[in-house]
């Protein structure tokens, strides 16, 4: 959760590194995912830090731009859900409940759905740092996912996995490897930028 302008700048820089971008500004009509992440972080900053009458018009305009670009790209991601270092790999449907909490350095692919179970809006996943969420993965309910986990394509995760550094996949999800091959790739991308 962004609580200062300094944190906003740190989040922006880490997201840029996670996306593998070295440019200073997004290119028009090309860097749409990066623009979406920038708007998401700016909106979180405005909501968390500038919640007064003077900033309401700026917050409203930023929210409208964020929602419009999200519809164009197919993203429905709640504000304050992700930590720094988010990498949205491609355009496509991605749905993340606004109450879900995902740690830093998350890679998420199209078709992913992180949502509430029938228990209510607070019955949502809590996901650790350095997690890879593969295409079409579904995570539901009050579950905890440890750090350094890869979630395979089309996995349906309905129970907690508290062992760090594993790969899970399947319907329902189960451990298929005792290591996380995507973790090294994620760290190389972040450290090389």
Q: Which residue ranges define each predicted feature?
A:
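Terminal amphipathic alpha-helical/low-complexity segments used for targeting or macromolecular assembly
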Residues: 1-73, 181-193
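Short N-terminal helix-initiation segments at or just after the protein's N-terminus
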Residues: 26-31, 73-79, 112-120
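Extended, non-globular alpha-helical segments
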Residues: 58-60, 74, 105-107, 118
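Left-handed beta-helix
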Residues: 79, 84-85, 89-98, 103-104, ...
